[in-house]
Amino acid sequence: MWAPPAAIMGDGPAKKVGNQAPLQTQALQTASLRDGPAKRAVWVRRRSSEPQEPTESKAAKERPKQEVTKAVVVDLGTGYCKCGFAGLPRPTHKISTMVGKPYMETAKTGDNRKETFVGQELNNTNVHLKLVNPLRHGIIVDWDTVQDIWEYLFRQEMKIAPEEHAVLVSDPPLSPHTNREKYAEMLFEAFNTPAMHIAYQSRLSMYSYGRTSGLVVEVGHGVSYVVPIYEGYPLPSITGRLDYAGSDLTAYLLGLLNSAGNEFTQDQMGIVEDIKKKCCFVALDPTEEKRVPLSEHTIRYVLPDGKEIQLCQERFLCSEMFFKPSLIKSMQLGLHTQTVSCLNKCDIALKRDLMGNILLCGGSTMLSGFPNRLQKELSSMCPNDTPQVNVLPERDSAVWTGGSILASLQGFQPLWVHRFEYEEHGPFFLYRRCF
């Protein structure tokens, strides 16, 4: 039976924690993060198939052998699913959330009854597939496919038995409460995990910075959020959600490239995604950037078929959609405007605290120049304040890293929801531990 480890002293200098802070934050505040994620394993007790050494006591002989297995942290995003063991500084496995489904004609032939192709399976099949994503703007719309993705991650990528590991899952801000109940149902009933916990993505991103308060600005693949957090508590009433993100930038870049004389199709979105990552950047001042001679912006990109194309001003024009969403026909606020809007909804004391703790997260923020541009826009909009944008080198994995830190702290161990508790009390027991 799975059980958390006994308390171990020496996690670092304890800090005073107010009673108002949630247990997740208390666990973080009582641990030193200077040396990276605390490397604490969770225990799983199971009977070993190996022969037991004879012992003097019958009780000792019948006691199951203990093996140390670390908790697994899973961050499911619209673009990628990242997973790995708690205590590590970065995820060890990362696959696309996009999966392949056989077309109906193929499925009816009976030649291949496999219904979902995940990860490397997409490259190792002759079946004609259509690509589908089980998430839409960060929210799960196809739980069966998510289960297929996790089955592949656990069995094929990590090569573990999920019934032997506790699992911590990330959940996006403002997601339906039913999300958590569905996660619990899947983990406990389909994977038989001994324990699980669900934590908000924005809170985990903040933990990766070693903070317990901050304004998390997260720009992922399918959705963007601006989330104020005070002493571990997200403030949903003033949280900002923007339904544009990295995938919209890729689609906009495709249009710009075609306007320049190229002929990319929707089926080549993966190539455009690669162009975005390797060639594009965010201009500090787009007006000044346009005055730069075209030859200084022009670079060559080699397509998979060997053909070369040239990119010029598209390299920085595509990212302007984050600051001027009308370019992609969106009526929502720009990222910088939404950030200031959230700050202005806070009271004076909280606003002052959050101004200096603007935490940038998400894969789309990895574009060169993104932090400096956001810093410039915020400083321009808040001349009487001193906004400070903070960045981590690997902020594209901030959610996962925060989960790795949290799940490996000794103070967090009482917050696991055990399978026997779920079976006894039902899904509503989740809300006593996951908040």
From Swiss-Prot:
GO terms for biological process: acrosome assembly; fertilization; single fertilization; spermatid development. Keywords: Cytoplasm, Cytoskeleton, Differentiation, Fertilization, Golgi apparatus, Nucleus, Spermatogenesis. Transmembrane segments: none annotated. The gene is ACTL7A. This is Actin-like protein 7A. Interacts (via N-terminus) with TES (via LIM domain 2). Heterodimer with TES; the heterodimer interacts with ENAH to form a heterotrimer. Interacts with ACTL9. Interacts with CYLC1; the interaction may be relevant for proper acrosome attachment to the nuclear envelope. One of its GO terms (cellular component) is nucleus. The keyword Plastid does not apply. The keyword ATP-binding does not apply.
